[in-house]
């Protein structure tokens, strides 16, 4: 089981060393969505990594489960100032999914069912930092929380953990996704308060 903790000590008066600046702890898990909630069943869900040459590496639900699901306990931090600590997740590490992907790109665009996009540096998805999550707190992800599968990138603000994930497309240069086009920071590190431009 992977246990991730991004804390670096008390920063600017935070009462909890695991709480980034400007964040407030919550016990519940707020639902925030930019649009309508897609209804995608696990039987119809697919996920693709597309390289800059157009080569596609794809998985359906069963194939994803066979890659190797792992347990993760981590903190999540939303740009709207809430944090939830010690969330239990199950998912597949992107390290496993990228094993056979050949690319010279440094950036990706994550695409979701419903049209949502978010950009990330490839380095933020590898080395045990990101997963395709299928469960949270011991239950399958509900549609409201991105089910059947969402990206989980807990070291960045939670808008980078795209719900209803369907594709990661490699990009040679950084391009803004949905929220990034609307004033959100290109990277979104909560410890640096990278909320907006």
Identify the role of each PLM range:
Residues 2-197:
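Structured, non-membrane catalytic/scaffold regions adjacent to prosthetic-group chemistry
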């Amino acid at each position: 089981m992977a246990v991730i903790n991004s804390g670096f000590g008390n920063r600017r008066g935070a009462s909890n060393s695991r709480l980034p600046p400007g964040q407030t702890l919550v016990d519940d898990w707020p639902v925030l969505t930019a649009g309508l909630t897609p209804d995608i069943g696990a039987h119809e869900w697919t996920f693709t990594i597309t390289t800059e040459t157009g080569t596609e590496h794809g998985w359906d639900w069963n194939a994803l489960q066979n890659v190797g699901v792992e347990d993760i306990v981590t903190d999540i931090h939303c740009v709207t100032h809430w944090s939830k600590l010690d969330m239990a997740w199950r998912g597949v590490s992107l390290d496993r999914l990228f094993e056979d992907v050949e690319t010279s790109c440094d950036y990706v665009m994550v695409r979701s069912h419903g049209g949502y996009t978010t950009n990330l540096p490839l380095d933020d998805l590898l080395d045990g930092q990101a997963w395709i999550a299928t469960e949270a707190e011991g239950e399958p992800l509900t549609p409201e929380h991105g089910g059947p599968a969402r990206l989980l990138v807990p070291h960045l603000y939670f808008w980078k953990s795209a719900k209803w994930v369907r594709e990661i497309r490699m990009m040679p240069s950084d391009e803004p996704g949905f929220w990034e086009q609307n004033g959100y920071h290109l990277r979104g590190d909560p410890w640096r308060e990278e909320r907006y431009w």
